[in-house]
Regions:
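Short acidic, hydrophobic short linear motifs in intrinsically disordered regions
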Residues: 608-619
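Charged low-complexity interaction tracts in eukaryotic proteins
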Residues: 633-672
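Short amphipathic alpha-helical interaction segments
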Residues: 622-633
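Short helix-capping/hinge SLiMs at alpha-helix to coil transitions
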Residues: 603-608, 633
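Hydrophobic residues on short alpha-helical segments
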Residues: 596-604, 628
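Patatin-like phospholipase
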Residues: 1-596, 609
Length: 675
């Protein structure tokens, strides 16, 4: 057996993803299946598999990543409970999931428009008491019930081994103290002070930190000790895993707070309700900052005297991903070893950060060189500018250009399909990416697809990517002949590489590619009906709660009923439908090329009356030739497109979208919108 020196440490980092958390959950689900199967093989056939150990020491999450990290840690401590896949082929992966609580939390429950007679979903209207002001567009109350249900561990099946949450043996692939970091966007802020010498009354610089986090330590989950000084000295709340909630039984306040904090990290602004957090000022006094330097200092805040006396600190939290959406620095700091050089080479590395990111795409970068900006241009750019700057991490640039760094790995969506020259990667890999991540709540099939894609991508990552060099000490200590069984040959480097986590048992059976999901027009119509009901319920209450003048309130209500509601719902319809068309997630009798779908989606989208080739070229990743060919393809469909000259420009539009004669000659309408 490998000794304590042959332990490879892992820090998981899970990026924010809204409904695409289903993908991250699938990745984590398969990761624990692979670790479990490997441990069984080490126990039963020790001479046939790699004998080093892996220790997951920390999991850091933002937004949806926080929910996945928090729920998965408890679920795995309650024991793997494999669920059979529907009609698996011979030789294929037999399981749909091994952590059903995670599957239920991300796939089954969080729907926008449930088919149930008495729906409890994100568009239900039971979250507002009479006269109360709406806290969010969607009904976030369902998420509270969902998290509570997912955290509650069901009784053990007959004959199952006793897991750590039920007093059984700790897991050999987790740390004794599993650290969970959840990022928060603190609406109140935490005050800090930097002293300067000078002659003024205030000798220093005051700052307010809104990028907050919660730190939980789950005790008794795994077997591995040896955490570093930074981690052991960082303030946090300890929870014994044997006190984890049980299904159908009330949980204590500490565990309720654990689930509530995970939800607070995922409180997407406006869409989902902000969450209240109450903690102790002492949590900030010994807090460590996750910088890469070896310094383990704390920087206490400059609290007002009143707060120092009360010791309690309460604030409202928004989505942690607003400020820190990829919290890999916490995972990185957690696995650094005291007194040792941070080795990153293929044959010297002793641990790694594994980041799971469903949306790794870069922020939009404008190719336009503008010389002036209107007030509206400034307002439109302000939020993305502040968000991107808040997420910028200069410390990470220090190692950004080190291509030989084997201590940073990423799992992100990849979906291959058959092409004319072999397999090709689809532009849209995940089904929950509709509407920037909210669209996964439109239908369970979207989330189910991404959960399985996460499992499939994780399997490929462990098999083909996550590795060390052939001269690594762990590999040299493997039993005779094992390295010949578990390896990949890199033709370019002319080297063998060996897996950090080998695939054995059921984990070696391939996870099949899930079928790409689509919804039909009837399902879309039902979703839009529910959106109308939700809007009819929420908007008048929002108007009434923020308008103290009765006459203004009545006028605003009339404007909404007579004009605003239909206008808004038309925009919502076209926005949803366009994104579904673009991503090939709406059933259609016609099959279009990728380029034609992109153009068709833009023609259908709200915002313009008429489109030009130049305008389409500007907003799409296509060039002008591709746009023109796509328009030619669409023009082959009878009664689909209109084309003609408008204001001396060659324009296109969907025939059903072309303004009628009355609309075109409306004196209050203004110039047609062309782009």
């Amino acid at each position: 057996m490998a000794d304590d020196k042959n332990v490879y440490e892992i820090g998981l980092a899970m990026a924010g993803a809204i409904s695409a958390g289903a993908y991250s959950a699938g990745v984590v689900d398969f990761l624990f299946q692979a670790l479990h199967e490997w441990e069984l093989a080490k126990r039963d056939e020790p001479d046939t598999v790699p004998n080093h150990s892996v220790c997951i020491r920390a999991a850091a999450g933002a937004s949806a990543g926080s929910i996945t990290a928090a729920l998965a840690a408890v679920a795995v401590a309650g024991g793997l409970r494999p669920q059979k896949a529907a009609n698996p082929e011979v030789g294929e992966q037999p399981y749909q999931c091994v952590l059903p609580a995670l599957y239920k939390a991300w796939v089954t429950l969080p729907d926008m428009a449930s088919a149930a007679t008495d729906p409890k979903d994100l568009l239900a209207n039971d979250d507002l008491k009479d006269g109360a002001s709406p806290q969010s567009i969607l009904n976030a109350a369902i998420l509270t019930a969902l998290t509570g249900e997912a955290l509650g561990l069901p009784d053990l099946p007959n004959g199952a081994e006793t897991p750590p949450a039920f007093g059984g043996a700790p897991l050999p692939y987790l740390a004794k103290r599993l650290h969970i970091y959840l990022t928060l966007s603190n609406m109140r802020g935490v005050p800090y002070f930097v002293g300067f010498e000078g002659g003024g009354e205030i000798r220093g610089h005051h700052m307010m930190c809104h990028g907050d986090r919660a730190h939980y330590i789950l005790e008794g989950v795994g077997t591995h000790g040896g955490e570093n000084t930074w981690l052991s000295g960082d303030s946090g709340q300890s929870l014994k895993i044997t006190t984890a909630p049980r299904a159908g039984k009330p949980s204590d306040k500490a565990w309720e707070g654990y689930g509530h904090t995970a939800l607070a990290s995922a409180a997407f602004p406006v869409g989902l309700a902000a969450r209240s957090i109450e903690t102790d000022v002492g949590q900030y006094e010994t807090r460590k900052w996750p910088r890469l330097s070896e310094t383990a200092k704390s920087y206490p805040p400059r609290w007002p005297e009143k707060l120092k006396e009360s010791k309690k600190f309460a604030f409202m939290s928004l989505d942690g991903g607003l400020i820190d959406n990829e919290p890999f620095e916490y995972a990185r700091r957690a696995i650094m070893r005291d007194g040792e050089k941070d080795e990153t080479g293929e044959s010297t590395v002793k641990g790694a950060v594994v980041m799971i990111d469903p949306f790794p795409e870069p922020p939009a970068f404008s190719l336009k060189e503008v010389q002036e900006a209107s007030i509206f241009d400034v307002v439109r750019a302000l939020f993305p500018m502040l968000k991107n700057q808040a997420r910028f991490k200069p410390d990470a640039l220090a190692t950004a250009f080190d291509n030989s760094n084997y201590s940073r790995w990423m799992i992100s969506p990849s979906r291959t399909v058959a092409g004319t020259h072999g397999e090709k990667n689809e532009r849209y890999a995940i089904a929950t990416g509709v509407l920037g991540g909210f669209g996964g709540f439109l239908d369970e099939s979207f989330r189910a697809h991404d959960y399985q894609l996460g499992r499939r991508n994780c399997q490929k990552f462990l098999r083909d990517v996550f590795s060390v060099g052939e001269d690594h000490p762990y590999v040299r200590d493997w039993p005779p002949g094992v390295a010949d069984k578990f390896h990949n040959y890199d033709k370019e480097a002319k080297k063998f590489y060996h897996p950090v986590i080998p695939l054995v048992g059921t984990a070696a059976l391939p996870v099949p590619a899930p079928q790409w999901p689509r919804i039909d027009q009837s399902r879309l119509a039902e979703i839009e009906r529910r959106i109308r009901l939700r809007a009819t319920y929420v908007v008048p209450r929002l108007i009434a709660s923020k308008n103290r003048h009765k006459l203004l309130s009545v006028a605003a209500g009339r404007a909404w009923s007579w004009y605003g509601k239909d206008k808004l719902l038309k925009v919502v319809h076209r926005t949803i439908e366009s994104d579904l068309i673009r991503r090939d997630q709406l059933d259609s009798e016609k099959s279009f090329s990728v380029e034609a779908r992109e153009v068709l989606a833009e023609l259908n989208a709200p915002g313009y009356d008429y489109r030009t080739v130049a305008g389409l070229d500007e907003v799409l990743y296509l060039n002008k030739t591709q746009v023109e060919k796509a328009l030619e393809e669409l023009e082959q469909i009878p009664n689909l497109l209109w084309s003609g000259e408008v204001n001396s420009q060659k324009c296109w539009a969907l025939k059903v979208r072309v303004p009628g004669w009355l609309e075109r000659h409306d004196p209050f309408r203004g110039e047609p919108r062309i782009g």
